[in-house]
């Protein structure tokens, strides 16, 4: 089974000339070589047109006195900024650490209270300690006195360092005073590990965590405001700490500034493109869907880590940024583009690709603004019933194994993530976990439209009593079968039995489009049906439901094949009543579609190492024109023709390359 793994600020921080897509590029901390870093920043602006550079300062306490490190680091930023005097480069700061990303290892430390985690380990310094609190104030005061163009905090401002924090004496005293309890740290850890979300002790500890993080950011902002309240700020969120992040972004923003938040959407070491990218694409889409209308400007995490071509190629770097702009994010945080690490220049390939495409991202952001999504609708959740602050069980906006990651991208089928289930669209439920997070009302609303339901989700729906609306009863049985028969195409599909087979019993009025069955050998005329496998049903709510035995947990050889893709597309055609738009290629491919003013805007990304010589699409529509967005931001005409039921475009697509096409209808 494949592992699943996509801004223009207010006037107070009008950061970048590019419309609606701002790059926050990080520059290497370069003590003694600030002139080199500044020269790099000037060249970066000249070549790419992006003017904002954040000088990276790792400011969590180290050494004794810890403030000495801060003085030296801030002085280095001052030299960097001075080297840029007279240049249009806007010198900002990335506070790469203030609490610290991971447990401490240095010897010379301040006598401040350490955080204690859920395993009883001493980890970082606790912000409740007066000494450390003053350190935070002093640090941001010194930063503000340099009047940076922007201050971005990093994702070390989080409520865990491997494990949940904080059970230090200061937090325990505060907790017990508020709750009127006398817990020891060990007793509270044990209590919380077994507690549910509505437990009063759980809620009280959760509030302390939020206050701990909020206190750090509010203290930082207060220190900045005491010096220069016009300095804009933003935050980076840690992966799956989304229950904390929005208040932090708002607290870090200057008065009148739109909050800025870098999302947790990185894809660092890209060794397994087809496995890692679908998860990343889906996360970007889900972040944008979840925070749409929140008033927060979202940045994707386009970091190259460890900041070289062993991590990420320049092509994939641009593809990552393209995905972010297409899904509607407002910009990206990038690392060390056109910078140095010590005496070694970071590959200028990253600079080259931005220079060659300096008009591309702003034009894309403008093109998708105000557009509507098309494609299968994957649920984006706003409830997190299984999220637990102590056991480290995290839930994201979309469930792992969802249809977007595991089925749509491998087959080049467009999808979207959605929070509301009232709209007339085709929904996709792939996992039991998705069904568990949906209320009965949510499910009824979905089932009054069009829905494709994969095996595990079908079983969960049957257990919830929705057989009358799906047209399928699902039971576990020991079935005898060795294949699936696709009656739409008259072919057999790979499908092996297991200890967890499901028997589908279809409503008599349902249409069975494929079956599980037994054939003694390939080509044998005998075929004994064991269960329906693809069932199409029109229910009493006016909905149409396609329920299938196919599911994301199957082995790859069963999940992905030309025959399997043809079966799914034909079944979706029957569900929707029209030809399903999709890639015309039998290979891994991101295909996302937005519609605007009679045009389709299509993002395609080739995730297969097999290059595509001519892009093609399975489409129900004829088109008047086809255009491709060029690096300079212009739309170039593409020769296209219909051939064998596909729209064939005379434009290639290399491995991990992205293309944005615009189809104008006749």
Pin down the residues of each PLM region.
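Aromatic-lined carbohydrate-recognition surfaces of secreted/lumenal glycan-active proteins
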Residues: 20-32, 90-98, 152-156, 202-246, ...
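Active-site-adjacent "subsite" loops/lids of carbohydrate-active enzymes
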Residues: 90-146, 161, 183-210
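Hydrophobic targeting/anchoring helices
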Residues: 48-51, 56-57, 160-162, 196, ...
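A conserved amphipathic helix/loop scaffold
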Residues: 415, 419-420, 430-666
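Short, acidic/polar
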Residues: 30-46, 130-143, 245-251, 313-324
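Aromatic-lined substrate-binding rim segments of carbohydrate-active enzymes
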Residues: 41-42, 58-110, 216, 220
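The substrate-binding groove and active-site-proximal loops of carbohydrate-active enzymes
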Residues: 22-33, 59-74, 118-137, 198-214, ...
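Catalytic domains of carbohydrate-active enzymes, especially glycoside hydrolases
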Residues: 35-62, 142-150, 259-260, 319-332, ...
